Amino acid sequence: MTSESATVIQMDDGRAPAPAAAGAAAAAAASSSYATAPTSISAAEPAAAPRKTTTVPFLLRSGAEGFRRCLAVIDFLLRVAAFGPTLAAAISTGTADERLSVFTNFFQFHARFDDFPAFTFFLVANAVAAGYLVLSLPFSVVVILRPNKATGGVRLLLLLCDVLIMALLTAAGAAAAAIVYVAHSGNRRANWVPICMQFHGFCQRTSGSVVATFLAVLVFIVLILMAACVIRRSK
């Protein structure tokens, strides 16, 4: 009895490679989807968010506008500083009054500011200057808030008024300084004796008023130079 070994040969009917082909197709599709994924993601990205702007204080802004604004702030502070000396000079001169009794109270010498026309003019000039400085503060604030070329007319107006007030204070201070000098030193040729040896309080008040007035004149000079510089740069 012979046994024959049966050999089984599997026939390829075209169905067996189907799973492999399907796997290859899926891999190709996945790779293609991965390749195109960044493009679709990048296309779907929203627009770039706006950058956050940091607010810079208006005093620190660079350029011509910041320069003009800084000078405007200094202008405001100088006007406030000049108001004190002019007001103090006016009050000190207006209250300069001293009496000197000789032997009895019925025989007295009197020294008062209105006895000298120069001191009267001096008092009025300082009062006008103090009032002007107060009235000019709102205009100075406008220049601070709007330091552009549109406020050139305001700057020019302040410049002209500053020049007039400086000239007024200079004239009044010079006239009062001459009287104070004569009161301290006298004049031998004219036979004018010094009176400050007797009227100490009167001379101290008037002398201090003259010094305060010339300090205000210096402040006005600085204001005029600053205003002229700004107007020159804005053209």
UniProtKB/Swiss-Prot annotation:
InterPro entries for the chain: CASP/CASPL (IPR006459), CASP_dom (IPR006702), CASPL (IPR044173)
Extracellular side: 92-118, 184-210
Major localization listed first in the record, in broad terms: membrane
Membrane topology: Multi-pass membrane protein
Localization of this protein: Cell membrane
GO biological process: cell wall modification; cell-cell junction assembly
Keywords assigned: Cell membrane, Cell wall biogenesis/degradation, Membrane, Transmembrane, Transmembrane helix
Ranges in the topological domain labelled Cytoplasmic: 1-70, 140-162, 232-235
TM regions (residue ranges): 71-91, 119-139, 163-183, 211-231
Gene Ontology cellular-component annotations: Casparian strip; plasma membrane
Assigned protein family: Belongs to the Casparian strip membrane proteins (CASP) family.
Function: Regulates membrane-cell wall junctions and localized cell wall deposition. Required for establishment of the Casparian strip membrane domain (CSD) and the subsequent formation of Casparian strips, a cell wall modification of the root endodermis that determines an apoplastic barrier between the intraorganismal apoplasm and the extraorganismal apoplasm and prevents lateral diffusion.
Subunit structure: Homodimer and heterodimers.
Protein name: Casparian strip membrane protein 2
Species lineage: Eukaryota, Viridiplantae, Streptophyta, Embryophyta, Tracheophyta
